[in-house]
Amino acid sequence: MNKYLVNILIGAFCWSGMSACASPKDEAKEIVDIIYKVNNYWQTQNPEHGRSFWDNAAYHSGNMEAFFLTGDSDFMNYSKAWAEHNQWKGAKSDNKAEWKYSYGESDDYVLFGDYQICFQTYADLYNIEPDTQKIARAREVMEYQMSTDKNDYWWWADGLYMVMPVMTKLYKITGNPLYLEKLHEYWAFADSLMYDPEDALYYRDGKYLYPKHKSVNGKKDFWARGDGWVLAALAKVLKDLPETDKYRQEYIDRYRAMAKAVAACQQPEGYWTRSLLDPEHAPGPETSGTAFFTYGLLWGMNNGCLLYTSDAADDRI
């Protein structure tokens, strides 16, 4: 596997005010301390569990990563209580004839990725304590979806993070190869709609394609959080995808190309702006995109897809 070089200021380090001479062990402890501080605050301030829509479910996908890192059962139990509150479901309609996948927040939008991201957490909880009821609805929904002749389910960038890892997680649990075939088919559609091969970045959705839509300075407008969703999705997919999968190299190549493009957009202070190629479009940090990029890039450094270096900025990858 070819290795690419990344030189990136990690946003979490910048925010935490770490000393440049701190040891790796001290830096790691400080990061874990920040995770505890933030996550404990969130959970104590939000004891009542909300719906299984993306706004809560995206948090729980991160909370489970915090559990895997720390081993703190309180984190896991918080997500488990949320899953139980939502009956281990996303949207709750049982009438398949009314299931939809355009934008909507009612219970008939079962096939909409905003209501499928919760399945990531359910699969993680299943792997910790196997119980078929935890993934019964996830399997029902995804296997129905895969039985249709549609391939345009992922029409916005967010959807790649929301559902791609669901399919690799369920493949690992079930061994059903259709999950990986449909994963690639749906991703190919999303690519054809949103990916810009010249800049190796994704538009938020079809409404933002250049030159139909432009930034304030007439440039291509790539949304930081949207591309953050995608880079993190690719990292999570590669984490679970079999080494023998016939499409694995495609995902690796795309991940590396995006990592190079993302690193080139980083601001000197360590953050990313909302419009990646036009910082003046919305000046200042876009924190959600910065967090996603930090996760996605660090995953590559920690798992042999990217190699950290202190080379000059124009040689970051």
Residue positions per predicted region:
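Well-ordered alpha-helical scaffold segments within catalytic/enzyme domains
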Residues: A58-S73, I117-D131, V163-N176, W229-Y247, ...
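Single conserved hydrophobic/aromatic residue that forms the stacking wall/gate
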Residues: Y308-I317
